[in-house]
Design a protein with these regions (language model features):
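Non-cytoplasmic
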Residues: 28-32, 333-334, 377
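Alpha-helical transmembrane segments of multipass membrane proteins
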Residues: 29-33, 146-150, 169-177, 205, ...
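Small-residue-rich hydrophobic transmembrane alpha-helices
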Residues: 44-104, 141-160, 268-330, 366-377, ...
Length: 438
């Protein structure tokens, strides 16, 4: 038998998440295509600057999704309806509160973001118009992260697909109507996203209500779920946010150091990063599945189930990582030709293609172990692991003056390897001492 029960359970959750992840860049492509057809490049520049500011802020707040998944999966495994309700309501209160604060302080936040980015006045003006509307979606966007994490934690496999696909399709339709039809330009693109986010929130709440009813969570439980000690949730979110900040800084450094190597290197790295991002979407699907299943095992204090999850994840995601490495080694040149038609960039990209073969095999373990640690809500250890990896990344950047762009890709490989290795050592120590469930 090719797949055992644990393998199938993993794929049931991983496959919808992989499919959902693929819809995310599709939305970006449509945004670019729609805005790119307007009569001035400043519109596209404004949306690009605005999207960068939003992406940075919301990536820092991604802890809302991750912590919610871990806490929910543990409550699900423990079969505790009150904890299940609290795992939804407390993060929702936090998300809505943070979203309202972003709306209230959006003007100074916009001023700060545009001051940091800089650029032409015309582009910054369009970015300002975009952000003034786009950040009105903050409560819905952050609440959607919580709902996505909670529905993933209860292993409702179809929910992420429905939420992301419906939200993105609605966004695309509204983009076309508001930008191209009503000629609202960047304000139309922002309004389309805001509307789609609130529509997604309504759908997500309906799904959550259905699960809560099936699990016997009463209205009285929900009303009281926001009470109770939030210190664990706040500490967990703090640690994951610091981890996310280090991750953002390291990937930002790749862009900064690449820019110093010349415009051709920036362009080539953008092409190669597209390939790496696609790989990450697939491997992230397994990480999400591991979060839910390992969290369930943690909540049930079931060591044998946890080992089953881990072995299945290693088998299945390991094979997927090897498949990506094989495809990139055999057909990488053809893929690059699809991504850029410039012969000079194609030739330059071929020099660094070897890293696309190496990185999936090196990086898969840190994705899986992230999932294990999120499921166990061990945020402090994830933060410390990321700090070790970031230090290794920084030291390896010293090779850039000698190795050039190979030094940048080596730094990324070291970063991924150290994340996986440090988490593996922590996991091994806990398992040997019998302290993983403590």
């Amino acid at each position: 038998m090719l797949l055992n029960a644990a393998d199938k359970a993993l794929w049931r959750l991983a496959l919808p998440m992989i499919f959902s992840n693929i819809t995310v860049p599709l939305l970006g492509l449509v945004d670019t295509a729609v805005i790119g057809h307007l009569d001035s490049p400043v519109y596209l520049g404004g949306v690009a600057v605005g999207a960068t500011a939003i992406s940075f802020l919301f990536m820092l707040l991604l802890f809302l999704r991750m912590s919610t998944t871990g806490l929910t999966a543990q409550a699900w495994g423990a079969k505790d309806p009150l904890r299940l309700a609290r795992a939804l309501v407390q993060p929702l209160v936090l998300a809505l509160g943070a979203g309202v604060l972003i709306i209230l302080f959006r003007l100074p936040l916009i001023n700060l973001a545009l001051h940091i980015v800089g650029g032409s006045e015309a582009v910054l003006e369009q970015a300002r118009r975009f952000l003034e509307i786009r950040w009105l979606s903050a409560p819905a966007s952050l609440a959607n992260l919580v709902l996505l994490g909670w529905l993933l934690g209860v292993q409702y496999a179809r929910a992420p697909v429905i939420l992301l696909v419906v939200g993105n399709l609605l966004n695309i339709v509204l983009d076309l109507w508001l930008v191209m039809g009503l000629r609202m330009n960047v304000q139309g693109a922002a309004l389309a996203t805001v509307t789609a986010e609130y529509a997604t929130l309504i759908i997500g709440l309906m799904m959550a209500k259905r699960v809560l009813t099936l699990r016997g969570v009463s209205l009285a439980m929900l009303k009281n779920a926001w009470r109770g000690d939030m210190r664990r949730l706040l500490a967990l979110n703090r640690d994951i946010m610091l981890r996310s900040l280090l991750l953002q800084l390291c990937f930002g450094a790749l862009t900064v150091f690449g820019a110093r190597l010349g415009s051709d290197i920036v362009a080539v790295n953008a092409v190669l990063m597209t390939m790496l991002t696609f790989t990450a979407y697939a491997l992230d699907g397994f990480a999400y599945a591991v979060e839910a299943h390992s969290g369930q095992a943690y909540g049930a204090r079931d060591g044998s189930q946890l080992l089953e999850v881990w072995r299945a994840a290693c088998r299945q995601s390991g094979m997927v990582a090897l498949a990506f490495a094989l495809v990139y080694s055999l057909a990488g040149g053809h893929i690059i030709a699809l991504l850029t038609s410039l012969p000079s960039l194609q030739q330059l990209a071929d020099r660094y293609l070897i890293w696309q073969t190496i990185l999936p095999v090196v990086g898969v373990w840190c994705y899986l172990l992230d999932g294990m640690f999120i499921g166990a809500t061990r945020g402090a250890e994830m933060r410390n692991s990321m700090a070790v990896a970031a230090a290794g990344f920084a030291v390896t950047l010293l090779t850039v003056p000698v190795l050039g762009n190979h030094g940048l890709w080596l730094a990324l490989a070291v970063f991924l390897a150290l994340r996986g290795l440090s988490l593996a050592l922590i996991w091994r120590r806990h398992w040997r001492r019998g302290t993983w469930f403590s």
